[in-house]
Amino acid sequence: MTSRLFALIPCAGTGSRSGAAMPKQYRTVAGRDMLHFSLAAFDACSEFAQTLVVIAPDDAHFDARRFGGLRFAVRRSGGASRQASVLNGLHALAEFGAHDDDWVLVHDAARPGITPALIRTLVGALKDDTVGGIMALPVADTLKRIDANSADGRIARTEARDGLWQAQTPQMFRIGMLRAAILRAQADGHDLTDEASAIEWLGHAPKLVQGSLRNFKVTYPEDFDLAEAILSRPAVS
């Protein structure tokens, strides 16, 4: 049986670093809620069986009417961490007929620059892989490590950037493998910040697939202006 594709977008975070009272996934960017752009990108990929959005149980900001015409489902099963929300989402995918051998692409709602072309590039690179992998970019900037004992932000040393990549999303893995990896990490007392870290914790080596600068993560207040500029122009294939 051919493995199917599912998308999972954890949306239970509060976006505290963005400096806004409203979670950043619902902030307006280029005339739309930020979440809209990720949903639209996956909706344009008809090969996906379902896109599932996981929100906090007490989320008062989500309004499905703002995403009219897009194909997705919602579950109010967000956890206290990203890892917990993703795990709950993996369990919920079974409601839509997902099996352990099917693929899931986990994507940050705060990366509105994702495009159908990027999604298909990732799927094409990984659909026959034994482990899976992630979108990522080679680190371009010089990296400095801060002196932990410095009160005014002094540099302790410069880190070599050779071989370093910056993780992006989507991150694509088999549902069964990712669930097992997260459960192992939880059992070992580790709350990991992305899915690849959990797969690594299980002893596997995910593959890196070249991403795009437009697929950056909106994190700080000034990032919204950059996202506005990017999303106001058509994506270049």
From Swiss-Prot:
<dbReference type="InterPro" id="IPR029044">
    <property type="entry name" value="Nucleotide-diphossugar_trans"/>
</dbReference>
<dbReference type="InterPro" id="IPR001228">
    <property type="entry name" value="IspD"/>
</dbReference>
<feature type="site" description="Positions MEP for the nucleophilic attack">
    <location>
        <position position="217"/>
    </location>
</feature>
<dbReference type="GO" id="GO:0019288">
    <property type="term" value="P:isopentenyl diphosphate biosynthetic process, methylerythritol 4-phosphate pathway"/>
</dbReference>
<keyword id="KW-0548">Nucleotidyltransferase</keyword>
<dbReference type="InterPro" id="IPR050088">
    <property type="entry name" value="IspD/TarI_cytidylyltransf_bact"/>
</dbReference>
<dbReference type="Pfam" id="PF01128">
    <property type="entry name" value="IspD"/>
</dbReference>
<protein>
    <recommendedName>
        <fullName>2-C-methyl-D-erythritol 4-phosphate cytidylyltransferase</fullName>
        <ecNumber>2.7.7.60</ecNumber>
    </recommendedName>
</protein>
<keyword id="KW-0414">Isoprene biosynthesis</keyword>
<keyword id="KW-0808">Transferase</keyword>
<comment type="pathway">
    <text>Isoprenoid biosynthesis; isopentenyl diphosphate biosynthesis via DXP pathway; isopentenyl diphosphate from 1-deoxy-D-xylulose 5-phosphate: step 2/6.</text>
</comment>
<dbReference type="GO" id="GO:0050518">
    <property type="term" value="F:2-C-methyl-D-erythritol 4-phosphate cytidylyltransferase activity"/>
</dbReference>
<dbReference type="InterPro" id="IPR018294">
    <property type="entry name" value="ISPD_synthase_CS"/>
</dbReference>
<feature type="site" description="Transition state stabilizer">
    <location>
        <position position="24"/>
    </location>
</feature>
<comment type="similarity">
    <text>Belongs to the IspD/TarI cytidylyltransferase family. IspD subfamily.</text>
</comment>
<comment type="function">
    <text>Catalyzes the formation of 4-diphosphocytidyl-2-C-methyl-D-erythritol from CTP and 2-C-methyl-D-erythritol 4-phosphate (MEP).</text>
</comment>
<dbReference type="InterPro" id="IPR034683">
    <property type="entry name" value="IspD/TarI"/>
</dbReference>
<feature type="site" description="Transition state stabilizer">
    <location>
        <position position="17"/>
    </location>
</feature>
<feature type="site" description="Positions MEP for the nucleophilic attack">
    <location>
        <position position="161"/>
    </location>
</feature>
